[in-house]
Design a protein with these regions (language model features):
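Alpha-helical transmembrane segments of integral membrane proteins
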Residues: 1-21, 285-288, 317-351, 355, ...
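Membrane-helix entry/capping segments
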Residues: 1-11, 15, 19, 51, ...
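Hydrophobic alpha-helical transmembrane segments of multi-pass inner-membrane transport and secretion
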Residues: 15-41, 291-327, 354-355, 435-460, ...
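Interfacial "coupling" helices/loops that link adjacent transmembrane helices in transporter permeases
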Residues: 16, 310-352, 715-753, 810, ...
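Small-residue-rich transmembrane alpha-helices
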Residues: 32, 36-39, 270, 351-418, ...
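Membrane-proximal juxtamembrane linkers immediately C-terminal to transmembrane helices
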Residues: 35, 42-65, 90, 130, ...
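Hydrophobic, regular-secondary-structure patches
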Residues: 44, 58-115, 122, 151-159, ...
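Mid-to-C-terminal secondary-structure elements
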Residues: 120-133, 146-291, 495-693
Length: 826
């Protein structure tokens, strides 16, 4: 019996090639979209699950609530936690710290900039990354040891084996380190990102302040990532309930008195499960870009909508096709088929395209996944498709889609009364017609919503990337990593040499590249203000502001003409206690420092340092220029020139001269500093990188939305074919009665235009709410209302045109046909 069902279903599929192709391709694309999202979601929620006992691993994070500044969630915590926490919490089995610092790897006469990660000895025991060479026990227990990833080992040491070989690094001081381990390259699904591991030692963390405190024990900053592992069977709840009190217990009383709030209010601690860091930590700047639940929900919803549209196509086509199979169903009933048998028959006819669509989806995923993985910067593998969970989900999804899509057609067709059908040759019911209209309306509501949302997301992303940040970033390049390792005088000589190069307009130095993330905080005291303030500072060359076309709103800018505009940064304040430094601040800093206006701030002084204070005089105020990450709000900032704090070279060049200027700069840097490997980047590219995730998301949204619209049009094409076939006699009668081809085409187009117009109106409120919520996460956002009004008008035109073009092919064909062929059997 089953073979008969199967053969009949296959014959029906072959007989109706157009509708079969629409169903198979539509369902296949829908299932492929769902499969891609399943793989993406599985990857996003798999972060850090590879570690042994991951359910017992936590990171202690903190939110800095510094008076006068916006709160900032940090992935770091106090270095002193390492010595104090285990003694106060018996549930803590182990604790490790990590900190990343820039330096260079020396090989011959070449110095390659790299990032070094300092960790406590137990780091690779707590986090069991795969080792290629070396033994986990004691791998970083002594000074002079280093662990590399396989990629870095090949890069700096050539082919293995690598164990026991040495690497020369320059950070704080020049030293030769012995390779005690090589790790497999880190997987993509971990929040960690490092290439070199070195043990924390006292020499690296020599006292940096006059008090003798270091990052290892100071409390006025968050220098370390701090991770803990709980003992088996112990809960985090009691520790989470008392961690605020623990911070208050050890936080220095003098600092609490200076800022006027408790330590736990200044740096609010948070215990974050390691496996939740990627998706749920509020930290914005981490080792890797954080995951976004809203993105997963959004793309998951779109893939589901694509599948729903494909299902609607199937239901509409199958129900409409019943008019062409009415006599077949009636004859089957006359020959003895009961309703159950017919129901099974039509459900099998639904399942075959569904599973054919699944095969189509598997092939499509195999072809698309490498590009999708590269574009989303995720390590997704088609091997995951054979995972029992993923495979069972896809097979189950195909089965559910097939059964549900065929449910209504099966119920309608198996319930036909043969006498009525054979007498009238009609099978259409008011319920079926109304359902089809409702489903078409729903399809185009989805299509209209996707068009509106996709266009608004694209407009916002483009706006955020091109918004005026308050400075001229065109025709500017950055050379990273030239500072700190070199003498300040040599750097200034280099700037003078580069200034004379053809195509170069201006050169300056700074401690940052515009568009980068957080900068350094500075503790200071303002006369007449009881509490000490912490504010960001940046080191900039005197001509920095003029190079970026930034003008003061009060006072003047830094200049080489004034000796006080050049400071010297020395770790011990006792050395520079007599120094007076001129600074420029932004308008946000005016408010934080308590001045009523930019003009009032000019010539005012503040004092930095805590033991021997250094006098700083405000000589100028600039607007709230967005030199930091464009994702964050503009905070209060102080600008001064500290020659030994600059790290980056900034060059303004003539238009279209990037290649020649960057090549010439490489030559000059190599001649003066042969060990330095330069990293040159167009400044606009650096700023655009901040929105790479949004660009990827908008492109994927456009791609998925386009798929949904194409599938909807495919379904409408098939439905129009069936609808017009059902109305052939009616059209023939209308032509006999004098209707023109234009009137018949207009009649058919109007039938499909009404649900499209209604669908657009229904979609508008949802789109407004969804886009408005999404825009809230941007510091710079478009004015929604005027854009929304324009886009909804465009969406109406687009959806109507799509519907008309889809239906027009059939409409023009039937309008030109002779009524003789429609009425010859009447």
């Amino acid at each position: 019996m089953f073979n008969n069902y199967l053969v009949s279903a296959l014959r029906s599929l072959v007989r109706n090639k157009l509708f079969g192709a629409i169903n198979v391709i539509g369902l296949g694309v829908g299932l492929a979209a769902c499969a891609l999202i399943i793989l993406f979601v599985k990857h996003e929620f798999s972060y850090d699950n590879q570690f042994t006992d991951v359910e017992r691993l936590y990171r202690i994070e903190a939110t800095a609530n510094i008076p006068g500044r916006q709160s900032n969630a940090s992935p770091n915590f106090f270095g002193a936690t390492f010595d104090l926490l285990p003694g106060d919490y018996e549930e803590v089995e182990s604790i490790v710290r990590m900190q990343q610092r820039g330096g260079t790897v020396i090989k011959g006469e070449t110095a390659t900039p790299e990032t070094f990660t300092y960790v406590d000895p137990g780091f690779l025991t707590m986090f069991d990354f795969d080792l290629i060479e070396g033994e986990r026990d004691g791998i970083l227990d002594a000074p002079g040891m280093i662990v590399l990833t396989e990629e870095m080992a090949i890069k700096h040491l050539g082919e293995g084996p690598w164990l026991g070989r040495t690497v020369t690094v320059n950070h704080i001081y020049l030293r030769e380190l012995k390779v005690t381990g090589v790790l497999k390259n880190l997987p993509g699904n971990t929040h960690f990102k490092f290439d070199f591991l070195m043990g924390i030692d006292k020499l690296t963390y020599a006292p940096q302040l006059a008090s003798g405190s270091t990052d290892l024990d100071r409390w006025n900053g968050l220098p370390f990532g701090v991770y803990i592992k709980l003992k088996p069977g112990r809960s985090i709840e009691s520790m989470a309930a008392s961690i605020d009190d623990w911070v208050d217990k050890y936080f220095p009383a003098q600092i609490q008195a200076l800022v006027g709030i408790k330590g736990s209010e200044l740096f609010t601690p948070r215990l974050m499960p390691v496996r939740d860091i990627h998706m749920f930590s509020p930290v914005q700047f981490d080792m890797r870009p954080p995951g976004k639940l809203s993105v997963i929900v959004g793309f998951g919803g779109i893939s589901l909508l694509i599948l729903v549209i494909a299902c609607i196509n199937f239901m509409n086509l199958a129900t409409a096709a019943s008019t062409l199979r009415a006599r077949e169903v009636a004859l089957r009933k006359v020959m003895g088929a009961n309703r159950k048998q017919l129901f099974i028959q039509f459900e099998i006819e639904s399942l075959i395209p569904a599973f054919a669509g699944l095969l189509f989806a598997m092939v499509a995923i195999e072809l698309i996944l490498p590009t999708f993985s590269e574009y989303t910067d995720r390590q997704l593998s088609s091997a995951s498709m054979t995972d029992p969970v993923v495979l069972s989900m896809l097979v189950g999804l195909a089965m559910v889609v097939g059964l549900l899509s065929g449910l209504h057609p099966a119920l309608i067709m198996s319930g036909f009364r043969p006498g009525k059908i054979l007498q009238s040759n009609q099978s259409e019911t008011g319920i079926s017609s109304g359902l089809r209209s409702t489903l078409v309306l729903f399809q185009f509501m989805i299509s209209a919503a996707l068009i509106i949302i996709t266009l608004l997301v694209y407009i916002q992303t483009d706006y955020a990337r091109s918004v005026n940040l308050g400075y001229d970033n065109s025709n500017q390049l950055t050379v990273r990593g030239v500072g700190r390792q070199q003498e300040a005088e040599s750097l200034e000589t280099l700037t003078n040499v580069i200034t004379k190069l053809p195509g170069v307009r201006s050169v300056s130095l700074s401690s940052f590249t515009p568009g980068d993330g957080p900068n350094t905080g500075l503790s200071l005291r303002v006369p007449g203000v009881s509490e000490r303030l912490i504010i960001f500072y940046r080191s900039v060359y005197p001509r920095f502001f003029s190079q970026f076309d930034v003008q003061p709103v009060a006072g003047r800018l830094l200049s080489d003409e004034f000796a006080g505009d050049r400071a010297t940064f020395v770790a011990n304040p006792n050395v520079i206690q007599e120094q007076q430094v001129n600074v420029v601040i932004n308008e946000a800093a005016v408010r934080i420092l308590g001045f009523g206006s930019p003009q009032e701030a000019i010539s005012k002084v503040y004092y930095r340092g805590s033991e021997n204070e250094i006098t700083s005089t405000i000589v100028g105020v600039i607007p709230n220029v967005h030199f930091g990450s464009p994702r964050a709000q503009v905070d209060g900032e102080i600008y001064m020139y500290l020659p030994d704090q600059v790290t980056d070279l900034l060059v303004s060049f003539d238009p279209d001269e990037f290649q020649s200027v960057s090549g010439a700069i490489e030559e000059k840097v190599a001649a003066m500093f042969p060990r330095i490997q330069t990293r040159i980047q167009h400044l606009q590219d650096n700023i655009a990188d901040q929105y790479r995730e949004e660009k990827v998301q908008s492109t994927l949204l456009a791609m998925f939305s386009g798929l949904a619209i194409v599938i909807a049009c495919m379904g409408l094409f098939g439905l129009a074919s069936l609808t017009i076939a059902r109305r052939t006699r009616e059209i023939g009668v209308r032509k006999v009665m004098g209707a023109s081809s234009r009137e018949i085409v207009a009649l058919l187009l109007m039938q499909f235009s009404k649900p499209v117009l209604i669908a657009n109106i229904i979609a508008w409120p949802f789109c407004w709410y969804a886009v408005n919520q999404w825009l809230d996460r941007f510091e710079y956002r478009i004015e929604l209302l005027p854009w929304f009004l324009g886009i909804i008008l465009l969406a109406i035109i687009a959806t109507l045109l799509l519907a008309w073009v889809t239906v027009a092919t059939h409409a023009f064909k039937v309008s030109r046909a002779s009524p003789i062929f429609a009425l010859r059997y009447e």
